[in-house]
Structure formats: structure tokens, C-alpha cells
UniProtKB/Swiss-Prot annotation:
This is Glycerol-3-phosphate dehydrogenase [NAD(P)+]. It is an enzyme of class 1 (oxidoreductase). It comes from Streptococcus equi subsp. zooepidemicus (strain H70). PANTHER family: GLYCEROL-3-PHOSPHATE DEHYDROGENASE (PTHR11728), GLYCEROL-3-PHOSPHATE DEHYDROGENASE [NAD(+)] 2, CHLOROPLASTIC (PTHR11728:SF1). It comes from the Bacteria. One of its GO terms (molecular function) is glycerol-3-phosphate dehydrogenase [NAD(P)+] activity. It holds the Pfam family NAD_Gly3P_dh_N. The active site is at K194.
Length: 339
């Protein structure tokens, strides 16, 4: 692929790791953020120490506070900002962007106020004449591993397979590989909802339960993620792929996962406000729990794990009692997808 200019909106851990992947592939990368000290550190010291204490970035990776500068002549734009500000940033992009570009996002969540997926927000806020069909970049990926060039395989999903293949070629190299998918609903709901299950798996660890219990929550968590996704129009097969079970495994079993760590802290009895303060990073699974619970209630979808986490976080229920309460739920068949 010829050299591309890529604007990455959001110099957090994942945005920074993806900037390095693109730089390794010979592309021109511009990171945009709104914290002057961070932008200055990236440009002068070539580090992003809030997220990676011992990583030195290539000097070719540039950062800016100026959105217009970041977007100038960009062939592709990658949103990697927290879910709650995606719409705001998309509005800003729409005001500044003066040419058509491939628009991607690599965030995982659902908008709290509208319950919308992030690709829908980008479609609504960025005029069609200024963008491709949205491409979702999602899958099992810890930034801490990608930044040291550990092997990572994820998904590029779009309603337009040509756009998905462009992103596949843009990112793929000897340690980072993308597979294409056209099931945007499935890929986005998998990426968002697995954070809830990761909180639950972490909570079990914090409560002192063993691998049997964690495996149960992850597996039955996948079942309820699939249940809701299919209700929203997704292909159930998507949840057996990288963006589904793959992401659930990596997020639901690892100390790298901020959602798992938050759940573990909740299981130990720590207060949510203290957990969020100590972590210093967005815990998407907390807000997504509320959104998913509300959608499930509205659509009549059975999501017992999500309900248990919701009641613990938002209604003050004891997390151990909430989880153990699921053991007395009605008996059900395991496989819901027989034809």
C-alpha cells in the first residue's frame, strides 16, 4: 500500500499503540489530543508516560492540539476517544474536515444517552460526502502488548467491504493482522458488551472464586451478549470470532484489562469512585452496563449477568449476593441457536 496520512483522534493507550503500528507500516501519523502536557511530551520526549512508562515512540509520530492540522490532507481518520465524547468530537471533525476520508473507530462502548453504537453516531454527525462507510476496528487487543509488537489479530468491519479491506491493508504487518467482516452490529456490540462480562469475571476473582466460576461467567456471558446482539440484528456467528469470543477471553481473563481490574476491586469491596480515581483511565464497562441493562429491559432480552452487575453498581446490591443469586435462576437449555 502507498504511504497514507492518518489522523488518530485520541492519544490514549490504544490510540498510541495503533499510531506505532501505522508508523511501522510507513504511514504518516498525526495524533490529536487536548492535553497540552501530553502533546508536548509526545513531540519532544517521544513518550506517552501516563500509559507507557518505558516505551519510546518513533520520532516520526507527531502530535497536535490543532484538529485542523491533524486532519489536513488525511487519507484516513481513526477515532479512539471515550464513548461519551465521540459525538462531540465527530461534530468538531465535521466542521473542520474539507475533503473525503476513510473514517474508522477503535472504541468500544454504547452512547449512554441514546444507546447508539459508535458507527451510527459517526454516520449521523459526519456528512456522507466527507467519509467512507464507517469501519470498526475491534478485537482481542491489549495496548500494552501491541505497543511492544506482540502478535495481535483483530477485525475490520464495515458495511462496505472495500473500506474494510482498505483498513485491513493499512494496518496489517508481521505482528498485527486484521480480518474483514461486514457484520458491523455484531462486531460493535461484541466489543462493547464484553466489557460488562469482564467486570463480572474480575468481580469473581476479587471475591475469591476459582477458574470454574470465571469460565462459567465468560461462557454464559457470551450467550447473553449474543442474545442481545441477535435481537439488534447481528449474525450469531460473529460472536464466535475475534471480536466476540476472542475479545471476551482477552478482556475477561487478564490483569491488563481495566474492566477486569475494576471488577476485581469491586469484588474486594472497594468503592466505584475510588476505583475510577485510582485507575486514571476510562472504564467503559461501567457505563455500558447501564446502557445494556436498559436495552435488555426495553427489548425483553434475558441478560442475568448484566442485570447482576447493574444492580451491584447502580442499585447498591451486594455483588456477591447478586452473583450467587444467578445460581437459583430458572433452568435453561445451553444452546439457543439450533435451527
Amino acid at each position: 500500500m502507498p504511504k497514507q496520512k492518518v489522523a488518530i483522534l485520541g492519544p490514549g493507550s490504544w490510540g498510541t499503540a495503533l499510531a506505532q503500528v501505522l508508523n511501522d507500516n510507513g504511514h504518516e501519523v498525526r495524533l490529536w489530543g487536548n492535553i497540552p502536557e501530553q502533546i508536548n511530551e509526545i513531540n519532544t520526549r517521544h513518550t506517552n508516560s501516563h500509559y507507557f512508562k518505558d516505551i519510546v515512540l518513533d520520532e516520526a509520530i507527531k502530535a497536535t492540539l490543532d484538529l485542523k492540522e491533524a486532519l489536513a490532507d488525511a487519507d484516513a481518520i481513526l477515532f479512539v476517544v471515550p464513548t461519551k465524547v465521540t459525538r462531540l468530537v465527530a461534530k468538531q471533525v465535521a466542521q473542520v474536515l474539507d475533503h473525503k476520508a476513510v473514517v474508522m473507530h477503535a472504541s468500544k462502548g454504547l452512547e449512554p444517552e441514546t444507546h447508539e453504537r459508535l458507527s451510527t453516531i459517526l454516520e449521523e454527525e459526519i456528512p456522507a460526502q466527507l467519509r467512507s462507510e464507517i469501519v470498526v476496528v475491534s478485537g482481542p487487543s491489549h495496548a500494552e502488548e501491541t505497543i511492544v509488537r506482540d502478535i495481535t489479530l483483530i477485525t475490520a468491519a464495515s458495511k462496505d467491504i472495500t473500506a474494510a479491506k482498505y483498513v485491513q491493508a493499512l494496518f496489517s504487518n508481521h505482528y498485527f493482522r486484521l480480518y474483514t467482516n461486514t457484520d458491523v452490529i455484531g462486531v460493535e456490540t461484541a466489543g462493547a458488551l464484553k466489557n460488562i462480562i469482564a467486570v463480572g469475571a474480575g468481580a469473581l476473582h476479587g471475591l475469591g472464586y476459582g477458574d470454574n466460576a470465571k469460565a462459567a461467567v465468560i461462557t454464559r456471558g457470551l450467550a447473553e451478549i449474543t442474545r442481545l446482539g441477535v435481537k439488534l440484528g447481528a449474525d450469531p456467528l460473529t460472536y464466535s470470532g475475534l471480536s466476540g469470543v476472542g475479545d471476551l477471553i482477552v478482556t475477561g481473563t487478564s490483569v491488563h484489562s481495566r474492566n477486569w481490574r475494576a471488577g476485581a476491586a469491586l469484588g474486594r469491596g472497594e468503592k466505584l469512585k475510588d476505583i475510577e480515581s485510582n485507575m486514571g483511565m476510562v472504564i467503559e464497562g461501567i457505563s455500558t452496563t447501564k446502557v445494556a441493562y436498559e436495552i435488555a429491559q426495553e427489548l425483553g432480552v434475558y441478560m442475568p449477568i448484566t442485570s447482576a452487575i447493574y444492580k451491584s453498581i447502580y442499585e447498591g446490591a451486594d455483588i456477591k449476593e447478586s452473583i450467587l443469586g444467578m445460581m437459583s435462576n430458572e433452568f435453561r437449555s445451553e444452546n439457543e441457536w439450533h435451527s
